Regions:
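Conserved alpha/beta-hydrolase catalytic His-Asp/Glu region
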Residues: 116-117, 137-194
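Conserved HGGG/HGGXW glycine-rich cap/lid loop of the alpha/beta-hydrolase fold
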Residues: 4-52
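Catalytic histidine-centered segment of alpha/beta-hydrolase-like enzymes
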Residues: 231-246
Length: 257
């Protein structure tokens, strides 16, 4: 695992857990804006950068390593934390453990543990792994699932970006793919969570509301203090990557009030 630090001159501390299946540069716009106000710690998961050896193991290991890293750097509390999708799963566990207090947290389309029978969870894993591999191998499927005219980053050439994304997805090992989906959907949480004073909001894009219904129900039950907020006209993880300025307006509205 690697953690990039931005905005070291700032006093307020932000932990940023990205989603999976996206390279570091997909978050450059958001991180550039956030680092103007925040000392930001951006997590890069194992198995997610070709130049870094190793496989992604689990949400649990990631949270333990992030917590240990920050404490070693003298960080004993965070002013803010953000996690998207798999990153939302990591943030949910970090909050639940209560070992690193957080003042305010945004769980953006965060994945929560399934409560299905074991056999059904194994079948879901098979579906997810096969789906990822099909997208990674087929440019046509990739563009059908994520139309370039909608999901190309601002200022980027669509063909060049999708060439880079297609090549990037092929760098994921079979072990990393399996562990991302299994751990992301089945990570352990304490019941009940540790007592925490964090203000929590769960974001979802309006276009992913149906897919997030189970996650929303879980968060409402597990963190009763959490607010639920829909982002108009957005799909999963679209706001943070494609619209960094708008993302930061939503971010500041919650974090800086």
């Amino acid at each position: 695992m690697q953690i990039l630090e931005h905005g070291q001159e700032n006093k307020r501390l932000l932990l940023f857990f990205p989603c999976t299946a996206e390279p570091v540069w997909a978050f450059e716009g958001a991180m550039r804006l956030l680092s103007q106000k925040w000392r930001s710690f951006q997590v890069i998961y194992d198995g997610h950068q070709p130049e870094n050896p190793g496989d992604f193991i689990s949400v649990e290991q990631t949270v333990d390593e992030v917590t240990a890293y920050l404490k070693k750097r003298g960080v004993t509390r965070l002013d803010a934390a953000y996690g998207c999708s798999l990153g939302g799963a990591c943030l949910t566990r970090l909050l639940a453990l209560g070992e690193l207090p957080v003042e305010r947290a945004i769980i953006d389309g965060g994945i929560t543990p399934y409560r299905f029978p074991y056999l059904l969870r194994r079948l879901v894993l098979l579906r997810d792994v096969l789906g990822f591999k099909i997208v990674a191998k087929s440019r046509r499927v990739l563009e059908a699932a994520f139309p370039p005219e909608r999901f190309t980053l601002p200022g980027h050439d669509a063909r060049e970006e999708y060439d880079a994304i297609a090549a990037y997805l092929k760098t994921y090992s079979a072990q990393t793919i399996r562990n991302v989906f299994w751990s992301g959907n089945n990570y352990a949480l304490p019941h009940p969570p540790a007592p925490i004073a964090a203000e929590i909001v769960y974001w979802y894009g309006d276009e992913e509301k149906k897919d997030r219904r189970g996650n929303i129900r879980f968060i409402k039950h597990y963190f009763p203090q959490a607010r639920i907020h829909g982002i108009p006209k957005m799909a999963h993880a679209e706001l943070v990557m494609i619209y960094p300025e708008e993302f930061c307006r939503y971010f500041d509205k919650f974090m800086c009030r």
